Amino acid sequence: MDENKNKALSAALAQIEKQYGKGSIMRLGDSDVAKDIQVVSTGSLGLDIALGVGGLPRGRIIEIYGPESSGKTTLTLQAIAEMQKLGGTAAFIDAEHALDPQYAQKIGVNVQELLISQPDNGEQALEITDMLVRSGSVDVVVVDSVAALTPRAEIEGEMGEPQMGLQARLMSQALRKLTANIKRTNTMVIFINQIRMKIGVIFGNPETTTGGNALKFYASVRLDIRRTGSIKRGEEMVGNETRVKIVKNKVAPPFKQADFDILYGEGISRESEIIELGVLHKLIEKAGAWYSYNGEKIGQGKDNVRDYLKEHKSIAHEIEQKIRAAVGLAETDSRVVPPSSGE
């Protein structure tokens, strides 16, 4: 590209960023993405890396969608737990009336401090969300789920009565109100969404999300989460293999993906990710079924190494920081590392 065109392009890019905000346009190959964005870990090291900035951005709208039992709520609860570790306040708008406090506690959520609302209709849910955001005192608000945000008119109407586009209009209006307040108060709002099938689609993907198109436009990050397999110990099923694709990302280059394990009753297995990424970045040596770290054998087979890292928290933390340094992410100094019971 000649010099004049380069100058014109640079001026246009600067004008776009000035008018629409940092991250509204970028080169796909850029690695030096916005470093001043405040983020919260997703609870998955691989997903934090794939997001490019080390986690989910604050002051933005996030959409997490996928099929049933794919790990949508687990991922949001992990994000809540990470926010609480940093001293933040979290709210859960349970429109599905399906939150399991015991499971949330097992994942690491401080349920005593978690704000929860079970609204009667979609308008009430979104009004509560807006009031919490405007207060400036809540750091993350989760809405579970968009599909359950039933408009008041539909609840009060007759069963079977056609209600065309009510939910889409409700979402569009609410997001217009929410966006400016979210940015001003630096609150993260996570919408969980479900998948539906479009009728009559022959070519292309028939899947779509509920609630119209507004959320697709307003979301800074959209995550597509899927269950890809099962984790077994002998004959017993102990968890799911999960893949998250970053469908949209306005704070870093999109279209990356992360694979991790979700263990029943535990949530995302950070130890499994440390093993996989440690081997990938040559921090952990793998010879046959044996794994070694700093020349010392730490276990035979992934399950045994996972147990070793659970017992030796400081070693797991040390490897994690080395992985973060290798990929250019900030160290998680705020993460509390309990004293290791196995040392």
Swiss-Prot record:
Q: What is its main location?
A: cytoplasm
CDD domains for this protein? RecA
Q: Cite a GO CC annotation.
A: cytosol
Record keyword Nucleotide-binding present: yes
Q: Does the keyword Repeat apply?
A: no
Listed GO biological process terms: DNA recombination; DNA repair; SOS response
User: What's in the keyword line of the UniProt record?
Assistant: ATP-binding, Cytoplasm, DNA damage, DNA recombination, DNA repair, DNA-binding, Nucleotide-binding, SOS response
Give the residues the record marks as binding ATP.
66-73
Q: Give GO terms: molecular function aspect only.
A: ATP binding; ATP hydrolysis activity; ATP-dependent DNA damage sensor activity; damaged DNA binding; single-stranded DNA binding
Taxonomy, superkingdom: Bacteria
Where is it localised?
Cytoplasm
Function, please?
Answer: Can catalyze the hydrolysis of ATP in the presence of single-stranded DNA, the ATP-dependent uptake of single-stranded DNA by duplex DNA, and the ATP-dependent hybridization of homologous single-stranded DNAs. It interacts with LexA causing its activation and leading to its autocatalytic cleavage.
Q: Which family does it belong to?
A: Belongs to the RecA family.
What's the protein here called? Answer: Protein RecA
Q: Which organism is it from?
A: Nitrosomonas europaea (strain ATCC 19718 / CIP 103999 / KCTC 2705 / NBRC 14298)
